[in-house]
Amino acid sequence: MEKDNQPSIEELKAFLQKNNIEYKNIDLFIEATTHKTYSKVNKNSKDYERLEFLGDSLVGFLISDYCVREFSSLEPGELSRLRSKLVDKLALFKIAQKLKVEQIIKTGPKKARNEVLSSSNVLSDVVEALIAAIYLDQGMQSAKDFIKSHFYEIANKAQNKPNKDPKSELQEYFQTISAETVKYETIEIPNKRSFESKAWHLNKIYGTGVGLSKKDAEKNAAANALSKLKT
């Protein structure tokens, strides 16, 4: 790390080499791993948001291409469901964890750095920005190779595994970033003969839901939380 605890160019190059990512223009990859909290105080630097914009579209296209080529037996509806599992933020976050992208992200000062690096959305966005950098620097085939290399395992698990209960999926998501369990605050609404539930994690409400039973209300609250986390 540099003196201000920012990753150095040498560390970025080592990260790329470790993950078999070739490069011609290292500046593209510096941009792909720079958060806006860093660029705000370092005026000559660019943040990853433009590359993330491109990467978001690339991921959608490349995942669709990958699914059609690799899963020839699936019907269009099945392909659509598989693609949706691969292009959401949770799948990208898993890739970010696998690559350990938090080690090469430039951010603002210490407080901002801690907040940024604990954000699953930021880590997911950096993966998309990296895919865009690979595409611009090395071309479409290299971007396809990256997708195939890092999404293959997730794709096979998603295809072969039935959809999880939303409460289980939400708990699994938070287990990747905290030991704290998800809690549900559920009340009965007498006049409507229904229940309303709120999904809490670390003193923050992530989702709400209503159901004819306590179980259904909590399930819907978890589903609501997941839909927000995936966008």
Swiss-Prot record:
Keyword annotations: Cytoplasm, Endonuclease, Hydrolase, Magnesium, Metal-binding, mRNA processing, Nuclease, RNA-binding, rRNA processing, rRNA-binding, tRNA processing
Binding site for Mg(2+): E52, D125, E128
The RNase III domain, residue ranges: 12-139
Gene3D superfamilies: 3.30.160.20, Ribonuclease III domain
EC number: 3.1.26.3
GO biological process annotation, one example: mRNA processing
Cofactor: Mg(2+)
Top-level class of the enzyme under EC nomenclature: hydrolase
UniProt cross-references to PANTHER family, sorted A to Z: RIBONUCLEASE 3, RIBONUCLEASE III
Functional note: Digests double-stranded RNA. Involved in the processing of primary rRNA transcript to yield the immediate precursors to the large and small rRNAs (23S and 16S). Processes some mRNAs, and tRNAs when they are encoded in the rRNA operon. Processes pre-crRNA and tracrRNA of type II CRISPR loci if present in the organism.
Name this polypeptide is given: Ribonuclease 3
Source organism of this protein record: Mycoplasmopsis synoviae (strain 53)
